[in-house]
């Protein structure tokens, strides 16, 4: 075994994991999720970075005398999209970070002394 061989392998593995993490973060930032409010009457599309891509509003909810309902539906759709981004991040990053966690070493068996 070469001196530092294990350390070199660990360093290379850490660099690979860091690269995968950066790639996953970039994918998440560009991923698009859909959020809905009012059972689909308002839909927003948001990137993982938080950028709002689009808002679609069903004409049925456009009532000049009741702007508050429309505002509530938009807020609900945005909140739903935010939850979708969080869920997507947990799914993608969770798998990656679980692969990075070190496994616990096996427990050492108890030692017995003769005559005790």
From Swiss-Prot:
It is found in: Cytoplasm, Nucleoid. The keyword Cytoplasm applies. It comes from the Bacteria. It holds the Pfam family YbaB_DNA_bd. Keywords: Cytoplasm, DNA-binding. GO terms for cellular component: bacterial nucleoid; cytosol. The keyword Repressor does not apply. One of its GO terms (molecular function) is DNA binding. Disulfide bonds: none annotated. Residues 96-116 are annotated as: Disordered. InterPro entries: YbaB-like_sf, YbaB/EbfC. Homodimer. Binds to DNA and alters its conformation. May be involved in regulation of gene expression, nucleoid organization and DNA protection. Belongs to the YbaB/EbfC family. This is Nucleoid-associated protein ML2330. It comes from Mycobacterium leprae (strain TN). The lineage of its organism: Bacteria, Bacillati, Actinomycetota, Actinomycetes, Mycobacteriales.
């Amino acid at each position: 075994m070469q001196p530092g061989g294990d350390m070199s392998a660990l360093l290379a593995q850490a660099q690979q994991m860091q690269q995968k993490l950066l790639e996953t973060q970039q994918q998440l930032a560009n991923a698009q999720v859909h959020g809905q409010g009012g059972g689909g009457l308002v839909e927003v599309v948001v990137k993982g970075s938080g950028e709002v891509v689009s808002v679609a509003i069903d004409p049925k909810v456009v009532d000049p005398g009741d702007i508050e309902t429309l505002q509530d539906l938009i807020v609900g759709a945005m909140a739903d999209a935010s939850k979708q981004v969080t869920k997507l991040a947990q799914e993608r990053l969770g798998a990656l970070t679980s692969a990075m966690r070190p496994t616990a070493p096996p427990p050492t068996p108890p030692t017995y002394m003769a005559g005790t």
